[in-house]
Regions:
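Generic N-terminal targeting/processing segments that precede catalytic cores or assembly contacts
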Residues: 1-360
């Protein structure tokens, strides 16, 4: 399985949803950086399951344990490995799914690729549970970026077609339900609960903003900042689309509307608008990076669906048992922040290599 991100950082995620533990190994972190474990724990708690009736009832503490790579809370230059123990699993809920794949889930494609050797319980390595170690890596990168004056925050833009059109604000990330407009957030929550009552699920959109990012990060072509961010965001299960700045809306604009006019602001070159989302030619221009990720509805639902029996090779119906989120979007907000943090910090490390080479 390809579960390693190769950049200036090498990030390898391991484990399965119902394995004894899940975790991550990060190679390439600078030595001498202190990791605030309390802050990291708070970040992971935003993603943790079992917090309220809007998410899965599976309860996991999600307390990260540093196995190696740090001494007294300070990175030592060796690869850093951290893990989270799985303590609340019910693998018997997935016995049926070994023969009848869930529509919309990776059960069928995993069966084709791995020939039945894959772990089905809880979705195995394909589970959203694996975003917890992604958040460990991203949470560490968030701390390191903050030292550079770079902040990353995300919020819910829409759920079930209900949209919060207000501009994103940094304070939103700390809310239990991270929306700008609380009244619209209440409507979103009611839509989630209505889908849950019907044995169904809903999807939505998360917007992420990166502020304080210097101009000049990223590369043209294959190493662009859009490429890097999108690659990591698509590591989050259920993400089906990513757009930057005006995104697909730019396709309906004229060039005179979409182009961001350059201007001077406090002695610095800025743009009057930000339709490009802070990136031009794959390289940051100093404006906030703005992107949105679209999440499909959770495929595991109690509502009866059509599927097939793999052993009998005939059509059948399936009602998915177990504990699942009626909407993954609220818990996905810190995951999007984590993915963005890894991409930006990785690009920052690369930029420093260029600067060192230029000086030498």
């Amino acid at each position: 399985m390809s579960s390693t991100y190769h950049g200036n950082l090498s990030i390898s995620i391991f484990g399965q949803s119902h394995a004894p533990a899940i975790g991550v190994t990060i190679d390439g972190l600078p030595a001498g950086e202190r990791i605030d474990m309390e802050e990291l724990g708070h970040f992971l708690a935003r993603r943790a399951p079992g917090q309220n009736r809007l998410c899965t009832p599976r309860k996991e503490a999600d307390v990260p344990e540093i196995v190696c790579g740090a001494v007294d809370g300070v990175t030592c230059g060796a690869p850093l490995t951290a893990m989270i123990r799985n303590t609340n699993t019910r693998s018997q809920d997935y016995d049926t799914l070994r023969d009848v794949p869930r529509p919309g889930h990776a059960d069928y494609t995993a069966q084709i690729k791995y020939g039945g050797a894959q772990d089905v319980s809880g979705g195995g390595h394909f589970s959203g549970r694996l975003t917890a170690p992604l958040c460990i890596a991203g949470g560490i990168c968030l701390q390191l970026l903050r030292q550079e004056g770079i902040e990353i925050f995300a919020r819910i833009v829409s759920i079930a077609g209900i949209t919060d059109g207000a501009p994103c604000a940094a304070a939103v990330s700390g809310k239990p339900f991270p929306v700008v407009t609380d009244e619209i957030g209440e409507q979103m929550q009611q839509a989630i609960l209505a889908a849950k009552a019907d044995g169904d699920s809903v999807g939505g959109v998360v917007e992420c903003v990166v502020t304080g990012c210097p101009a000049g990060l990223g590369e043209p072509m294959f190493g662009g900042m859009e490429n890097r961010i999108a690659q990591l965001v698509f590591a989050i299960p259920a993400v089906k689309g990513v757009e930057f700045g005006a995104g697909f809306a730019a396709a309906a604009m004229r060039g005179s509307e979409n182009n961001d006019a350059f201007c001077m602001e406090n002695g610095e070159i800025r743009t009057a608008t930000n339709n490009c989302g802070g990136i031009l030619g794959g390289i940051t221009n100093g404006m906030p990076i703005v992107f949105r990720a679209a999440f499909k509805p959770t495929p595991s639902i109690r509502r009866e669906q059509r599927s097939v029996s793999l052993s009998r090779m005939e059509e059948c119906t399936l009602s998915v048992p177990g504990r699942h989120d009626p909407c993954i979007v609220p818990r996905a907000v810190p995951c999007v922040e984590a993915a963005a943090a890894i991409a930006v910090y990785d690009a920052l490390l690369e930029a420093r290599k260029y600067q060192k080479t230029a000086r030498d």
